[in-house]
Amino acid sequence: MVRKATKKTIKKVKQVEEFNDDDEIIEEIVEEIEEVVEQRDEVNDEFQEEEEELEDDDDDEDDEDEIVFTSIRTTATTTTPINQHNDKEKEKKKDKQEEYIDSDDDDDDDGDENYYLNNNNNNNNNINNNNNYNNNNYNNNNTPTEPIKTETIFYNPPIRKRNEINGTVNTVSGGKSSKNIIEKMGEQSWGDMYTPSKCLQISKQNCELQSKYYTEAQLERLSSEIRRNPSMASKSYHFLSLGLTTKINHQWIRALISMALLISLVAIIFYLPLPHLKHIIMSPTGPSIQTSKTTGEFDQFDFNNPSIATKLTAFKDNWRRFSIVGVSNFLCSNYNFNPIDYSDGGGDGGDGGNTSIPKEFSTVQELKNLKIFGSCILFGVILFVVWLFATRLAEKEIIIKSNLPLQFLHSILTLLVIPLLSMLFWSLVLLYFIQTLLIGNQVNGQEDIFYCVNHLSNSLSEISSFSPARELFLGSVGIVMRLVNYFYPLSIESLALHQSTLYDTKNVYQMKLVSFLWTIIVGSFIYHTFLISSYLYSIFHEYHPTTTTTTTTTINTTTNTTSNTSQQSNPLSKRLKSNQIDPSSFNLFSLDVKFLPSFIPEVLITQNFIIVFIWTIAASLLWIYGVPPNLHIHEGEIFFIFIALAPLIKSIYNLIIIEQKKDKINQVHNEISWKSEPEILELQRQRLEQDQLDQQQFDELIDN
């Protein structure tokens, strides 16, 4: 029917072109078009009835998808011929419209053409509206009508792909399939697709704990940064003001402990006697030591006798030879201090009394060298751990959480424990290299020991010709031997670890004790050599913040005066310059040098230079004048007293600096301190008023 109607319309249109004055033909065309529109309305009503029936069967989600899919297919099949026919009809009508537009007709004919065109446009609009209505009905059945909520930000919907062949829905990614959710959690449950919220509500107590932990973490981070860069602490006067009491207490504790060590060292040197010895022979093949049968040898000296110089020289030379023999026997013999002991009994130097050797080692010497190396590692690890613990205690002081027991423990570790462990570590390192290089695998037994002793004796004799090294070594030997002779007296042969006295297995533990003492003696020489070298090095490579800050401030002032001369008359700038804080006034690492003349360098008042200067004066006096012979004291022992003065000088120096700059730090801290909110607002208001007043005065000066 539709096709026949369109054919008739085409014929009628052609007739209209030939007979424009025939109104009856136009009326017939309009009636036929209205019949076509009525037929399309009937088809659309049938489609709407089918869709309403599909909406009633919407219980299951999967069934609904299939129904919608089939309905789309049915509508597509039914509407396609009509759409094709409508397209053809539109094209023909457009052609007719163009022909009407191109033709030159009368006014009456134009009116008829406009009537025809308006009717065609209305019909086209009706067709488009019907198509849009069908599409809207389909979309309304498949899309939610509610607006999108803000929580969709946290929603992770599944990507569902429709299988056009079977008409089923497959879940590609995101979430679970609808059947699993319905079985476990009920219909329309998509709770697993919501990510858990990060905004968790916590209690007030947990909030306080979190803020406390965060504060402690930031303080520890600050303490580590200050420990790596000590000058950072001088940039905060609040920080320095709060920590002044802690620093003063710590320095007093260190000063008291240093004073106690100094007094005990003086008592050992002046009140504990040395063991008597004479006729020290350097030959390793024969008896190397002869004991003194007479006591009070030095009491029989006549100091007015000119020949006393030879006897004093013999005294010094005997102790020099004794120290060389003792060190050689310690480094080359079988009785070496070793926590991982390689033998249980004495011997003649061949196998150390231990006959059972593991298969991995060909000789006892290999096992011995390995255990000495293990002892080096052991003491190195212990030293490192103790140093870390002492550093941690120093950080506690930096973050103002150090109490008196912690400060006392830190002082004991840094003044006693760490130096003693360093001595043991360096002595074992030297022992390992000597045992490995000079003795090796001990193929020839006793001959290798004599070879090692001979080489070491010659080397140490050459080193002892340098008087500072000789006196430093004799000082450590004299202090240790005084302690042993007073608390646990032994023979000279035992103290020198002479090989002929070691056959008795009953004296094994006694020899181990003496070996431990020689370990301290050798380590003390190495440790104090490094200590003196570090003080000498620090004089020329010490950081001087005062000089750098003064130079930078002078450069800044010169540049400001040259570039902005007009600001000199500004009272506001003058007031700001007068209130500027000099960073050198807060530096707790150097003295205030304002009292010094300009031609004197600041390095002369640093603590390291003062300590080295005292050591130099003491060594020069001891070298020139010596020690009175009636004291029976080595010059090296007196020099150790001045070495023990170094921690005390440091503590006194730091206390002087703090006392010198304490008032300035507290003054600035009180002027610009942490205040409550009303006080801060009042202070800001006062400053704003003062700035406005200064600006007015400055403007008046410019106008004048």
Curated annotation (Swiss-Prot):
Q: Where in the cell is it found?
A: Membrane
Q: Where is the composition biased (Polar residues)?
A: 566-576
- Please tell me whether the keyword Transmembrane is annotated for this protein: yes
Q: Where is the composition biased (Basic and acidic residues)?
A: 85-99
Q: Which GO cellular component term is one of those annotated?
A: membrane
Residues bearing carbohydrate: 166, 354, 556, 560, 564
Q: How does it sit in the bilayer?
A: Multi-pass membrane protein
Q: What are the Low complexity biased-composition ranges? A: 114-142, 550-565
Spans traversing the lipid bilayer: 255-275, 370-390, 414-434, 513-533, 609-629, 638-658
Q: What is its main location?
A: membrane
Ordered alphabetically, the record's keywords are:
Glycoprotein, Membrane, Transmembrane, Transmembrane helix
Listed Acidic residues bias regions = 43-67, 100-113
The segments labelled Disordered in the record are 37-145, 550-576
Tell me the PANTHER family matching this sequence. Answer: B BOX-TYPE DOMAIN-CONTAINING PROTEIN-RELATED, NF-KAPPA-B-REPRESSING FACTOR-RELATED
Q: Could you identify this protein by its name?
A: Transmembrane protein DDB_G0274347
Species this protein is from: Dictyostelium discoideum (Social amoeba)
Phylogenetic classification of the source organism: Eukaryota, Amoebozoa, Evosea, Eumycetozoa, Dictyostelia
